[in-house]
Structure formats: structure tokens, C-alpha cells
């Protein structure tokens, strides 16, 4: 009889990925995925960049390359982190990964032994929870509100908990709630972290997708002790199919991530890195991101206006000012998984929120994505969702 490692008992397929199989049908109005709008992918420009790479350096592009990543792309990433996040870094502090999801997996493998404690926001990104589970940690959820992680609660936990090895956070337009941390909490968080000297994994896939207000500093830009490991990605600002992300950290920490990448995949795709670098050289990434923001902002406004009009009393919704998601809290007696099945019968999909709480509970919550559906479908789908909620109120 085949015997698997005990860690496999802790792992299960992502509910979101499983749901996406159901929602692939063209007649489904899906608010389930966190996917960018495919009509915004710069396909023709990417074809030009790809052709240029293969004509100029085809044999290099199709060969193995260094684990650290394509040097020119790493420098372009460092330059953009300075321009957009005020993070002073260089190519030597950048490791290119196969998406930031791989950076999450490496973070767990670098820092966590079985029984170690991970602190994270409540709720938090399901993909990170699943990546961390393979290393068999204990999760402690830190309460949040509209300003982000509540610092008083974080201090209480740190003062009374042993074996805290890592803190995982998404300060900008958090997945699943869409909420950003306010400026004061970012500064207070770093003061606390510096006192306890615990490594922080800052996941920032949505930082450039702000629709309202001023950009706030990344935690990494406030880091004076080298405790923040910053994860970035091209998935939300260019194209997820290339599977290109990066880790930015102090060299002694980055060396451990480098070992993990050597063991896991040797390197990220050479041709993908070179084509992305060439695209950045040939075209205007800032203009492309501005186009993405304008599209998502329009869809966000339509979703929020429809929710404000249709969502029954007793339900609440966040007001995201960036990112891809809105978060709905239903009456406590309502089960979002049961609601999901009823909505799927009406060809509408969303993600039940309980999956985003690693310790369970909160089954009366749900996550909505607004980036992938055209405005008329958003109105139709949200109206149907809210009608179904009303039909199930007590």
C-alpha cells in the first residue's frame, strides 16, 4: 500500500481553483477568481518583444540561466521598486521566482519547522495558507478592521506566544477584504517588528492598483533592520501566464531563498524573463498599468453602486480603494457555502469566505472579484446574488 508523508493529510486543493473549474462555462457570471482581465493583456506587443528576443538572443533565451534570474530584469525590478515603492535596492537583492506564489512556498520552507507559529491577518490569502501548511505550522490570526491589522492585538499575541517564526501580511488592498493598512499602522507595525525582530513576509501583488487616495509606503521601505521579505509579481500588472514574481530581501536571507529555488525548479523561465524585460524596454509599463487601473476602477464602481442599491439590510460590504476584491459579511446565521450552491444554479459564482480563515469559522462571509466581468454582467450578477441573499433571510 502506498504511504504518503503525514503533511499530505493537512493539504487539500484550493477551493478557489476547484471553483474556477465550475465557472469556466461561458454562461457563468463569475466573481470568484482573482484573475486580471484577459482583454487587457498586451498580446501584440508581447509578440513583438518575443520576436525581438528570439531573433537577437534565441539560443540564450532557450537555455538554462542563473537561479537568481536574468540580470537586466532584476535591475528593472529594482528600479521600479524605487520609483513606485521608495524601496532602495539593487539587482543583488532580487531573486526572480515562478510567480510570487513560489515566493510564499519558499518563505515557509526557509523559516518554518513543524509546530512553529505563523501570524497572519484574519482573514488572509488562501493560497498563502495552503503554501504554509506543507511545513505544518500553527496559525494565529490577528484581528483586522478597516485600517488593517490591529496593532494592540498583535502586541498581545507577540507578548504571550512562543515560537513565532514569521508574520505574513498584505498591507495594500488585502486579499480577500480589499482593505489597505493606514499609514499609522504601517509605522507602528514596523516599530513592533523591530522590537521583536521577527521576519515579515510582505506580499504586494496589488500595490499599483490604487483607484483613490495617495499611495502609502511599503513596509519594506520602512524597514531599517532587514526584517521584511518583499514579494512582488508581474501577474497583476502585465500577464500571469509568464509566472514571474520576485523576492527582495537582505542578501543573507535571499541566499536561503536561492537554495530553495535551486532545489525546486533551478530557475524561473529564461525566455519568459527575457521577453518581459524586452517588453519593459520597448513599451510603457506605466501607461499599461494606468489602462488597467481605469478599467478596474470603472468595474469596481459599478459593483459597489449595485451592492449599495441591492444588498439587504443586515449585510455589510467593504469599500475597496484599490486591488481586485470586495468583501461581504452576511447575517451570522447564513452559510455562504449554501448560498454559493443556490447562486450557481442561477449562473453566478463567488468564493465563500470561510476558506480565508485558517482556523475555521466565519462561514457567513464571501469574496467578490470585479476585475474580470464587464459592467453589464456585474450589474446582472450582483443583482441576482443580492436577490438570492434576500430569499434566504430569516
Model-derived features: where do they sit?
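PLP-dependent enzyme catalytic core of the Aspartate aminotransferase-like
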Residues: 345, 359-394
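Conserved core segment of the aminotransferase class I/II
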Residues: 224-294
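Conserved core of the PLP fold type I
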Residues: 60-197, 201, 207-225, 296, ...
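Conserved PLP-binding catalytic core of the aspartate aminotransferase-like
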Residues: 314-346
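A non-catalytic, amphipathic alpha-helix used as a structural packing/dimerization or gating element
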Residues: 72, 256-259, 290-302, 380, ...
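Conserved glycine-rich beta-strand-loop-beta hairpin in the small C-terminal domain of fold type I
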Residues: 277, 294-304, 316-329
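N-terminal small-domain helix-loop-helix segment of the aminotransferase-like
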Residues: 7-99, 106, 281-282, 349, ...
Amino acid at each position: 500500500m502506498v504511504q504518503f508523508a503525514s503533511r499530505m493529510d493537512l493539504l487539500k486543493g484550493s477551493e478557489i481553483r476547484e471553483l474556477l473549474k465550475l465557472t469556466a462555462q461561458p454562461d457563468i457570471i463569475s466573481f470568484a477568481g482573482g484573475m486580471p482581465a484577459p482583454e487587457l493583456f498586451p498580446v501584440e506587443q508581447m509578440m513583438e518583444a518575443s520576436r525581438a528576443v528570439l531573433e537577437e538572443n534565441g539560443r540564450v533565451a532557450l537555455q538554462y540561466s542563473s537561479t537568481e534570474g536574468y540580470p537586466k530584469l532584476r535591475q528593472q525590478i529594482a528600479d521600479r521598486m524605487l520609483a513606485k515603492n521608495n524601496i532602495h535596492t539593487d539587482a543583488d537583492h532580487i531573486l526572480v521566482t515562478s510567480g510570487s506564489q513560489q515566493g510564499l512556498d519558499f518563505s515557509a520552507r526557509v523559516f518554518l519547522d513543524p509546530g512553529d507559529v505563523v501570524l497572519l491577518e484574519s482573514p488572509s490569502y488562501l493560497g498563502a495558507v495552503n503554501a504554509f501548511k506543507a511545513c505544518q505550522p500553527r496559525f494565529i490570526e490577528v484581528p483586522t478592521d478597516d485600517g488593517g491589522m490591529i496593532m494592540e492585538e498583535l502586541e498581545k499575541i507577540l507578548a504571550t506566544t512562543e515560537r513565532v517564526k514569521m508574520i505574513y501580511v498584505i498591507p495594500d488592498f488585502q486579499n480577500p477584504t480589499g482593505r489597505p493598512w493606514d499609514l499609522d499602522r504601517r509605522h507602528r507595525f514596523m516599530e513592533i517588528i523591530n522590537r521583536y525582530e521577527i521576519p515579515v513576509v510582505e506580499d504586494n501583488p496589488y500595490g499599483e492598483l490604487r483607484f483613490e487616495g495617495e499611495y502609502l509606503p511599503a513596509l519594506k521601505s520602512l524597514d531599517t533592520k532587514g526584517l521584511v521579505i518583499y514579494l512582488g509579481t508581474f501577474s497583476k500588472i502585465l500577464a500571469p501566464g509568464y509566472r514571474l514574481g520576485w523576492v527582495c530581501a537582505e542578501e543573507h536571507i535571499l541566499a536561503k531563498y536561492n537554495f530553495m529555488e535551486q532545489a525546486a525548479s533551478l530557475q524561473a523561465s529564461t525566455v519568459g524573463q527575457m521577453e518581459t524585460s524586452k517588453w519593459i524596454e520597448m513599451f510603457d509599463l506605466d501607461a499599461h498599468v494606468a489602462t488597467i487601473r481605469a478599467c478596474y476602477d470603472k468595474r469596481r464602481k459599478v459593483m459597489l453602486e449595485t451592492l449599495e442599491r441591492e444588498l439587504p439590510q443586515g449585510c455589510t460590504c467593504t469599500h475597496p480603494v484599490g486591488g481586485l476584491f470586495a468583501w461581504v459579511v452576511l447575517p451570522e446565521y447564513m452559510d455562504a457555502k449554501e448560498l454559493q450552491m443556490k447562486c450557481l444554479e442561477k449562473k453566478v459564482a463567488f468564493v465563500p469566505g470561510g476558506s480565508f480563515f485558517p482556523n475555521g469559522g466565519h462561514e457567513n462571509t464571501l469574496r467578490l472579484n470585479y476585475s474580470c466581468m464587464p459592467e453589464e454582467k456585474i450589474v446582472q450578477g450582483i443583482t441576482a446574488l443580492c436577490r438570492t441573499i434576500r430569499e434566504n433571510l430569516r
